């Protein structure tokens, strides 16, 4: 998987073979990439467009629809295939074919032992931040945000597709847990499958990921005893499929796997046939906590895209709908949802754009409706609805579109992030998807506690021997 420490593993393998007196030949697939300039121009045109008016901080793009082979020079790929075939015929010792994509459909049939190195999403992001990874086809590490964007839309996409093929078609001989380059664990592929199959016999919970944020609070930090060094805790990713991992204990040893590796291996057992038939091996729900308890402000005023917009522009599977379940509140907590009854929505958008340029605040409460937050309240947030979690509460956020995150911030109170940089605003995209018709009365009738609708009714019944 992308960012896994392949060079470290290859060095260890070479050393062990040398100790046994076995000759080693090494072939790196990174030599097969298309020329950097050619590949970068192609991706910029098709997947990573740079339009600073629409996307000021270059956050979004379109998922790459191909495979590793589609990023390689076909002549170089053919030459590599011929070289592998020749070595199998007349070579001596061991040839190590290594690199991201080495087990692609074209080259895999020529390999006698197929080993896959995997790593958790958190470890992958830490390696990106430390500059320990180069994007596909690049000679040096890009700036972190550019590297992360290219990873999401290209590198991670082709890596996940290949991992699915290898797991689903049982193509692996060995699987390496490569979260820590200094302490890797190699498992026979049959053992990996056995661990995952056994896990399906029990309830399981993912290992959470905790992130600081400019609006972060302190409820979860205190409740779960998080490190005091954390400035706060804004997001608690209990089940964001592309962010979390699972830990299983085997003979006293804890083994940590990416949750999505489990999904790709055990999809029907984990999600059920109906879900797989509808969504494929895509985990169709996510949930996380947003903590503004005793924080210094609200979440940003934001909205999310519907199906047509996000599929056409980003290549994603579907719309981003959400709901908030209010878990705990402090004094004055409110949840922002929809527009005020007589709000001038076009004026709000103009004010948001003006604020984005001149850095002056907007009277957002003049335009955005809010309700008093009470524990136990649930609000639905269909795509296109303006919304925000207000200060001083803990909410459980349940949503769809579980891999990407398309949050179009319309207004963020002229705040800077924890690094001192202005937070990104996406008024262009927000304007395109915003549903202007969702005002106070409609919100109260349809989105708060299910609109207080009666789904079914009948005569009461006492079950069991005692009331």
What would you call each of these model-derived segments?
Residues 6-21, 122, 130-133, 153-218:
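NTP-dependent small-molecule kinase module
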Residues 1-8, 33, 100-104, 385-387:
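Gly/Ser/Thr-rich loops at beta-strand to alpha-helix junctions
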Residues 78-138:
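ATP-dependent NMP and nucleoside kinases share a basic, alpha-helical "lid"
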């Amino acid at each position: 998987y992308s960012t896994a420490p392949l060079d470290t593993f290859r060095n260890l393998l070479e050393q062990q073979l040398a100790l046994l007196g076995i000759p080693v030949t090494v072939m790196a697939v990174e030599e097969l990439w298309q020329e950097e300039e050619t590949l970068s121009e192609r991706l910029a045109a098709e997947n990573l467009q740079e339009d600073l008016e629409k996307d000021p901080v270059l956050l979004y793009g379109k998922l790459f629809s191909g495979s590793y082979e589609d990023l390689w020079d076909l002549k170089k790929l053919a030459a590599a295939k011929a070289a592998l075939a020749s070595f199998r015929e007349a070579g001596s010792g061991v040839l190590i074919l290594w690199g991201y994509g080495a087990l692609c459909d074209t080259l895999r049939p020529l390999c006698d032992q197929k080993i896959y190195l995997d790593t958790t999403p958190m470890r992958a992001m830490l390696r990106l931040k430390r500059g320990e990874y180069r994007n596909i086809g690049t000679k040096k590490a890009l700036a972190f945000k550019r590297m992360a964007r290219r990873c999401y839309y290209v590198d991670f996409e082709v890596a996940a597709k290949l991992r699915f093929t290898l797991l689903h078609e049982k193509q692996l001989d060995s699987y390496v847990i490569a979260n820590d380059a200094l302490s890797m664990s190699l498992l026979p592929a049959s053992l990996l499958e056995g661990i995952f199959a056994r896990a399906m016999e029990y309830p399981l919970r993912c290992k959470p990921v905790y992130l600081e944020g400019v609006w972060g609070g302190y409820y979860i930090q205190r409740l779960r005893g998080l490190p005091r060094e954390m400035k706060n805790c804004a997001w608690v990713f209990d089940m964001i499929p592309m962010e979390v991992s699972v830990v299983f204990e085997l003979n006293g040893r804890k083994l940590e796997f990416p949750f999505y590796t489990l999904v790709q291996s055990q999809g029907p057992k984990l999600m059920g046939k109906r879900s797989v038939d509808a969504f494929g091996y895509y985990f169709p729900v996510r949930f996380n906590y947003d903590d503004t308890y005793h924080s210094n402000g609200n979440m940003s005023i934001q909205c999310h895209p519907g199906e047509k917009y996000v599929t056409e522009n980003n290549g994603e599977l579907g719309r981003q709908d959400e709901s908030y379940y209010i878990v705990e509140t402090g004094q004055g907590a409110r949840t922002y949802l929809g527009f005020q009854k007589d709000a001038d929505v076009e004026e709000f958008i103009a004010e948001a754009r003006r604020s984005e340029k001149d850095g002056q605040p907007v009277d957002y409460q003049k335009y955005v409706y809010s309700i008093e937050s009470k524990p136990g309240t649930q609000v639905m947030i269909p795509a296109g609805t303006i919304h925000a979690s207000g200060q001083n509460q803990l909410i459980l956020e349940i949503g769809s579109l579980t891999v990407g995150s398309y949050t179009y911030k319309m207004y963020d109170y002229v705040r800077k992030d924890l690094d001192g940089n202005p937070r990104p605003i996406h008024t262009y995209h927000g304007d395109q998807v915003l549903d202007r018709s969702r005002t106070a009365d409609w919100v109260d009738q349809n989105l708060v506690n299910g609109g207080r609708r009666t789904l079914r009714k009948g005569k009461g019944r006492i079950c069991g021997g005692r009331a």
